[in-house]
Amino acid sequence: MGLSGMSANMEFGKAFTTRPTGLHGYYKYTPAVINKVDRTPAGVTIVQGETMDQCAIFIALAKKTFTFNNKNEDQYIQYATDPNIIAYGELPSGAATEGDGYVEFNIPLKYKNLTDQPTHIIVVCSSSKYGDYMTGGVGSTLYVDDLSLIYDGTPTIWE
């Protein structure tokens, strides 16, 4: 059975009220060639059977929860423009990790301003960057370990 035509309602956000400066952790990623393509985001070119999958790890702070259906792209969260998102950060590269060990990462949160307080946190770790479009490589594997929020330093302003 393929994934084409399947849909899911997703709910993002858990109650959370502090203002960290980033997300720290370790990951190990082994991608597969993308062999399942239902849809792709505008501006993204994927050649089924040739394009390597990518992982996605990101964090957002919000003023609400978000519920959307993965088949309705109009409901997808627009992190840069949604006024309910107050901070966002993502792993810069979703490429494969080298060797057998885990790779350390630090994702700085970029705040839209220094005054808004979050009510919810969103953390997403996906072995297929476009999994919400039902597109990815069967067999892509992402392991994540020892996630922690960082509270040191001055918050970065989103520009």
Predicted ranges, named:
Residues 1-67:
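Extracellular-facing segments of soluble proteins and assemblies that are Gly/Ser/Thr-biased and enriched
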Residues 15, 106-110, 148:
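Generic structural detector for well-ordered beta-strands
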Residues 19-21, 53-55, 103, 138-145:
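Residues that flank catalytic or metal-binding motifs in active/ligand-binding sites
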Residues 23-27, 31, 118-132, 147:
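Extracellular beta-strand-rich recognition modules
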Residues 25, 158-159:
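Terminal processing/anchoring signals of secreted or surface-associated proteins
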Residues 30-32, 64-66, 112, 128-130, ...:
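Short coil/turn motifs at secondary-structure junctions
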Residues 66-118, 137:
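Extracellular carbohydrate recognition and processing domains
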Residues 99-101, 117, 128-152, 157-158:
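Extracellular carbohydrate recognition
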